[in-house]
Amino acid sequence: MILKHPQFQAYSSIHIAGIEGKPFDIEIQNGRFTSVKEAEPRHVQAEQPQQKLWISPGIIDLHTHLAWTDFDHADQLNRDSREVEVMQAEAFAATLRTGVTTARDAGGILPSTIRHLVKYYQQPLRVQTSSEMLGAADAKGVKHLEGRLAEIYATGAGWIKIMATGGLGAPTEKVTEPNFSEEEFAFIVRHAHANRKKVLVHTWGGVTIDWSIQAGVESIEHGMFLTWDQAGRLAESGVAFVPTTSIYRIAADPKGVLALSPVICERAARAADAHATAIGYAKRAGIRLGFGTDYATPSLHGYNLQEFDTLLDYGLNRAEAWKSATQDAAEILGSGHELGRIAEGYVADAVIYAADPYQAQNADQLRKSIISVVTGADEAGLI
């Protein structure tokens, strides 16, 4: 159940995820938390037992692709526009149902499309977007890049996405080679920041991580070939790291939902193996980590919580993993003053559970424990 922009909602003796042994009385008015206080002891009659509930902030997915309907974009081009629109609306609905109340789309969807989907399909998912991505085809000098950036700004996007290296489509031995010159890369970041846009950088590793640190981008994505030296400098710079770990483990499975070719599966497996080391470096160095899935197909939307499983497998504790999906994710978006916490004055984006989410054994158990999702905004507040 999605509870949209509640005018008034009260929860008595509810437990906040991550705070043990202290139930809280929580009130929401006009879509914001107005009271969060430790509950006074109550006498509950034996014949009227109270259901024990937990609440967490709404989950923030910092790297998703809500407009994409197929792993191979050529397949999406074969679909008619009405079919694509319905599938995009279903992606919004599935994402909300799994407890994700805010998403940063990492390329592919326009702000105008978001407004349309929110309004006509009644799905109050808060989305920040980067519209179109800048990739190898745009490495034609700063004059060309200036024009491309102007086009992206005109869409209303708040983020600029730089495809700084290859990905699963590139041979492993070449995947960290830069798509842009250092001059072009620095120009993009400088121009974006001058126009009050934030920058996220797709990079598997290599020199483009160094460039990202030097330029002061907001976040790097994937980063599985991050070195220990780079991790230290990344932490010092304040640049965030959104590793998107689960998608590579999914892609590596030849019998999985993506059913990719053996060559792609092998590349994904190498990436997944490297990610465990990169997460270890990031944790030791104190890098701000952000939760992101890189999910882009109907078989994956709605299963965003799988990212918790891989983050835990790769060495984060539960508090660190949850912080990456709430408080730290909100800070990365520039919304740490109003999202990512159960606190008075904050937007009431939240998830209600029938069991302690910190004790869930896996993403499937966590997802099944969700009773309702609360969105502080309704559709009108997001368009």
Give each language-model segment a name.
Residues 194, 272-357:
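His/Asp/Glu-enriched, well-ordered alpha-helical/loop segment
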Residues 53-119, 183, 215:
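Metal-associated gating/positioning segment near the N- to mid-region
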Residues 87-113, 124-135, 156-170, 198, ...:
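Divalent metal-dependent hydrolysis catalytic cores, especially in the metallo-beta-lactamase
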Residues 1-43, 53-55, 351, 357-360:
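N-terminal metal-binding scaffold of metallo-dependent hydrolase/deaminase domains
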Residues 65-96, 124, 128-131, 166-182, ...:
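Active-site gating loops and adjacent loop-to-helix segments of metal-dependent hydrolytic enzymes
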Residues 70-73, 115, 209-215, 247-260, ...:
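Histidine/acidic-residue-rich catalytic or RNA/ligand-binding cores of hydrolases
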Residues 16, 325-327, 331, 344-383:
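C-terminal cap of metal-dependent C-N hydrolases
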Residues 144-164, 169-241, 257-258, 268-289, ...:
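Histidine/acidic residue-rich metal-binding segments in metalloenzymes
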